Amino acid sequence: MAKKSMIEREKKRQRLVEKYREKRQQLKAAMADPNIDQATRMELHAQLQKLPRASSPTRLRNRCWKTGRPRGYFRDFGLCRNSLREMAHRGLLPGVVKASW
């Protein structure tokens, strides 16, 4: 199980990403406009740099909702491989069957 502080830090990052999503998209769209001059583009870039570092979606890390484990993450379930295996064996994941061929 991951430390509670790491899980909370990740939740804080998710809140920051949501809070600044619109502003970040607007700034990036304005910077991508080919009709603006270089000085305006530099000003937009400076505004983008002033946003909190943790508000960038790149800094998010997928974590298991059950254990908080950051590695071996399955997006379809939101679980790490260990929790996925355990829950599948118990029959807690609908539609998941043990493979045989």
Curated annotation (Swiss-Prot):
Instruction: Spell out the subunit comment.
Output: Part of the 30S ribosomal subunit. Contacts proteins S3 and S10.
Whether RNA-binding counts among this entry's keywords is yes
Q: Which InterPro entries match?
A: Ribosomal_uS14, Ribosomal_uS14_bac/plastid, Ribosomal_uS14_CS
Per the UniProt entry, what species is this protein from, by scientific name?
A: Synechococcus sp. (strain JA-3-3Ab) (Cyanobacteria bacterium Yellowstone A-Prime)
**One GO molecular-function entry:** structural constituent of ribosome
Please state which protein family the record places this protein in: Belongs to the universal ribosomal protein uS14 family.
Pfam families found in the cross-reference section: Ribosomal_S14
Its job: Binds 16S rRNA, required for the assembly of 30S particles and may also be responsible for determining the conformation of the 16S rRNA at the A site.
Q: What is this protein called?
A: Small ribosomal subunit protein uS14
- Keywords, in A-Z order: Ribonucleoprotein, Ribosomal protein, RNA-binding, rRNA-binding
- Is Ribonucleoprotein there in the keyword field? yes
Q: Which GO terms describe its biological process?
A: translation
GO CC terms for this protein?
cytoplasm; small ribosomal subunit
